[in-house]
Amino acid sequence: MLRLFLSHLLGVWLLLSLRARKIPAQEEVLKACGREFVRLQIRICGSLSWGKSSQQHREPRQAPAALPEIVSSSITSGAEALNGMLEYIPDLPQELKATLSEREPSFRELQPSLKDSNLNLEEVEKSILGRQNEAEDQSLSQLGRSRLDAHSRIKRSDYIRYSDRCCNVGCTRKELADLC
């Protein structure tokens, strides 16, 4: 009889403790305005991202096997960049261009050839900057035509609506986590 009573008492105690744990802090209504709202938002979004990273078990890192491939590709891209720069130099001797196509010369090998050619650094800079400005203008016009700017406005308006609501009425942690 005593054993049955204790088991029922233990069951009631477990149910009550489970009920107390079941009320999450996310349902608590918080009022925050201005800086307090921003700090709360940062705290909530930061805790969400840290929680995700701490739940993942990370394996020990090993050295990448493709390291030589990465180094060789960076050397190749450096040579391509140098060849691209040399296209902008009009008075460059053909011997130097042929040397570049055969192998990648060091700067010391290039220096005498560059002294012989009458290079005007300002002309090179103007031509490079002119092409960069044209590329920037094209990318900005493409962005204006796309709907990316409209999406950012919508997201910003959602954020403003939540901040006003949290200041005047109050909001829950779950609602703030939706903005992350």
Swiss-Prot record:
Subcellular location: Secreted
Cited function: Relaxin is an ovarian hormone that acts with estrogen to produce dilatation of the birth canal in many mammals.
Alphabetized UniProt keyword annotations: Cleavage on pair of basic residues, Disulfide bond, Hormone, Secreted, Signal
GO cellular component: extracellular region
Gene name for this UniProt entry: RLN
Principal location class: secreted
PANTHER family reported in the protein's UniProt record: PRORELAXIN H2, RELAXIN
Protein name, entry field: Prorelaxin
GO molecular function: hormone activity
Subunit details: Heterodimer of a B chain and an A chain linked by two disulfide bonds.
Family: Belongs to the insulin family.
Propeptide: 53-154
SUPFAM superfamilies: Insulin-like
SS bonds (residue pairs): C33-C167, C45-C180, C166-C171
Signal peptide location: 1-25
The organism of origin for this protein: Felis catus (Cat)
Expression sites by tissue: Expressed by the placenta. Exclusively detected in cells located in the lamellar placental labyrinth and absent from other placental and non-placental uterine parts.
Superkingdom of the source species: Eukaryota
